[in-house]
């Protein structure tokens, strides 16, 4: 898993388990949103979301870069969705994610 619940809670600065269910749901949504915005195929996402050091599609450096990029994007999306649960502007979020994920979207990584 690219971002664990523990990492997500640390990023959100949540110390208790009271919101674990909400955070898990938002983390799943943030991850899916980033995969969709990056236009990753299931095979590409499987490579990035695994512990592999290389694959048919990516060498080690590319996998590392893709994982770091996706991790930042997922955490950003998670934070946004968590903070704006009531009034999220998904257009603004999507535009920011497109910028963050540009290299993946265009196949540069």
Explain the meaning of each model-derived region.
Residues 1-109:
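Divalent metal-cofactor coordination and adjacent catalytic microenvironments
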């Amino acid at each position: 898993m690219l971002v664990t619940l523990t990492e997500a809670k640390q990023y959100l600065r949540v110390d208790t388990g009271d919101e674990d269910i909400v955070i898990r749901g938002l983390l799943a949504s943030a991850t899916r949103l980033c995969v969709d915005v990056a236009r990753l195929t299931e095979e590409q996402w499987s490579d990035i979301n695994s512990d592999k050091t290389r694959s048919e599609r990516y060498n080690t450096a590319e996998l590392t870069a893709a994982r770091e990029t996706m991790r930042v994007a997922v955490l950003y999306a998670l934070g946004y969705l968590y903070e704006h649960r009531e009034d999220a502007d998904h257009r603004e979020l999507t535009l920011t994610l497109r910028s963050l994920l540009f290299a993946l979207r265009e196949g540069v990584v």
